[in-house]
Amino acid sequence: MGEIAPEMEISQYTKDKASCTRISIESYYSKRVTQCAERENRLKKLEEDISARGLSDEEKEEKRKIHHSKETDYLRLKRTRLTVNDFESLKVIGRGAFGEVRLVQKHDTGHIYAMKILRKSEMVEKEQTAHVRAERDILSEADCDWVVKMYYSFQDYSNLYLVMEFLPGGDMMTLLIKKDTLTEEATQFYIAEAALAIQFIHSLGFIHRDIKPDNLLLDARGHVKLSDFGLCTGLKKFHRTDHYRNWPSTLPPDFISKPFESKRKAETWKRNRRAYAYSTVGTPDYIAPEVFQPNGYTKSCDWWSLGVIMYEMLIGYPPFCSELPQETYRKVINWQQTLVFPSDVPISIEAKATIKRFCCEAERRLGNHGGLDEIKQCPFVKRIDWNHIRERPPPIRVTVKSIDDTSNFDDFPDEDLTWPTSTLIRPEEQPGRRGEFVDFTYKRFDGLTQKMRYSDLKKFQQAKKNKKGGQQGTSD
């Protein structure tokens, strides 16, 4: 009788390869089902559009031929591998703890995008892989005017790339820094649009958890779009709140009694605001108190954040802002004592009542039980035309001079616009080889079939030519 062979010890490398293979196979079949459903939906929308227009048989057939041609192009283009060399880097428009955002132009279509570039090594080291995966998954699923649209996602050995629509209006943080405070009419408009965006995310089954002015982007007309979904629920680790949990939450005896003039407080807040936006930890100003607690939270935490933003729009700074994030954290935890309204910045009774209904206990918070329908009944926003708000002109006009206008963004002077030399890294040195970034690639149907209007492309090319000519003339 032969001896039983001892069990072979499986190496970590083999386990990682097996895990990646399993994820790839599962993803492949899941994507096949999803793509089939999406194709059927596009055909259904086409037929509905054809029926609504009352076209002749010849016109209907022509529409169907164009659609089938697009579907064929889409299948072919999906097989092509995207790299950074398919884009021209124009300008750095944002920088964060883990990467940067660039204004780019796609070579074959001439279309302008905002490209978020994230370093894989930083993602793995700082345990942010689940966050970027969440953002990629939600942006690929979301197809709505209230959410920033992602057209492509891809990766190379060093970096992850999210290619999104460029929104030249900037963000709400920049607008608030410029304007100090907003009128109640303007506040009603922006709070209503933000509420519609939040409700859409909730309808997908997600909680955003990071609602703040930085993440409320403005399109070319000045309408709101929600962005940055890296902290949506479904994740087991919430990096930012973990950072605060070891801090003391009790207030010193004289903590609230210190007088602080509103104008001076607003100036201090503005001075520190951008530094918070670009830091790893950020600021706890907009985070609901229950998110810091171990007992859990619900989607109502997003409505708390909206109440804090509303306060900032009307008063000029968030209700719990302090010189140090530790102090802000203590104020948020003890909101019953620290949520006060300054006497030198008068606001209406309706506005104050709405803020108090957003910033209160989770179980009785505005929006907690009835969602958007409950918020619509609030006196402060009852005059809003909710069904047609996106067709209406925003209260504050956004100035956009060209398709690549970045005047509503911060300047990042003397930045190197060359692409990272990621291809020099060998595959075996690739960060995150245990399946973190498997199946990261995404291509949107209307992104692959759209072209820039010829007139816009010619204007853009002429503007670039003039700019280069001016720079050469200066150097001569």
From Swiss-Prot:
Binding of ATP: at which residues?
93-101, 116
GO CC annotations, alphabetized: axon; cytoplasm; dendrite; nucleus
Pfam families from the xrefs?
A: Pkinase (PF00069), Pkinase_C (PF00433)
Q: What is this protein called?
A: Serine/threonine-protein kinase sax-1
Which stretches are annotated as coiled coil?
none
Q: Which PROSITE patterns match?
A: AGC_KINASE_CTER, PROTEIN_KINASE_ATP, PROTEIN_KINASE_DOM, PROTEIN_KINASE_ST
- This entry's Enzyme Commission designation comes to 2.7.11.1
Q: Which residues form the AGC-kinase C-terminal domain?
A: 382-452
Domain Protein kinase intervals:
87-381
Instruction: List locations, semicolon-separated.
Output: Cytoplasm; Nucleus
Q: Which InterPro entries match?
A: AGC-kinase_C, Kinase-like_dom_sf, Pkinase_C, Prot_kinase_dom, Protein_kinase_ATP_BS, Rho-assoc_Ser/Thr_Kinase, Ser/Thr_kinase_AS
Tissue-by-tissue expression: Widely expressed in embryonic and larval neurons that contribute axons to the nerve ring and in hypodermal cells, including lateral seam cells. Also displays a punctate localization in muscle.
| Known catalytic reactions | L-seryl-[protein] + ATP = O-phospho-L-seryl-[protein] + ADP + H(+); L-threonyl-[protein] + ATP = O-phospho-L-threonyl-[protein] + ADP + H(+)
Q: Which cofactor does it need?
A: Mg(2+)
The positions flagged as active site in the entry are: 210 (proton acceptor)
Q: What does this protein do?
A: Acts with sax-2 to restrict the growth of both primary and secondary neurites. Regulates mechanosensory tiling by controlling the termination point of sensory dendrites.
